């Protein structure tokens, strides 16, 4: 699930998060609207109401602890040679994070963080808008 980073300041609503459509590349903002009598989750399709967006960062994070853990497990299992093998095999898997600023027709401005797959779906949804 995409991570809502904040930005919408409206006392009548509470943002729950940003979700990706199950069978398509669209995204919804999920929120409670306190002006309504029910506390049902409301959804707003971002692609249909987007005025503008801007990608502000794209980062690749890696975990150095993974390699150290692999080395320790290998060392404990078979000594120094296995420690080196464990460090080499465990590697440092990297993961991407993209932060995007959005502005909707209703005036809402917010930031959302997407992983690699969500970002691909985001780009696909934005390409369909054109």
Regions found by a protein language model. Give the residues of each.
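A composition-biased, non-transmembrane "mature-region" signal
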Residues: 1-130
């Amino acid at each position: 699930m995409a991570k809502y980073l904040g930005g919408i300041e409206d006392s009548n609503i509470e943002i729950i998060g940003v979700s990706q459509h199950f069978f398509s590349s669209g995204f919804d903002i999920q929120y409670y609207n306190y002006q309504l009598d029910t506390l049902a989750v409301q959804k707003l399709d971002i692609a249909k109401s987007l005025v503008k967006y801007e990608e502000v960062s794209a980062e690749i994070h890696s975990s150095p602890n993974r390699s150290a853990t692999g080395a320790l497990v290998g060392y404990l299992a078979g000594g120094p040679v296995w420690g080196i093998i464990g460090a080499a095999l465990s590697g440092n898997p990297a993961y991407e994070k993209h932060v995007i600023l959005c502005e909707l027709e209703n005036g809402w401005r917010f930031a959302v963080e997407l992983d690699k797959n969500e970002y691909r779906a985001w780009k696909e949804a934005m390409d369909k808008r054109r």
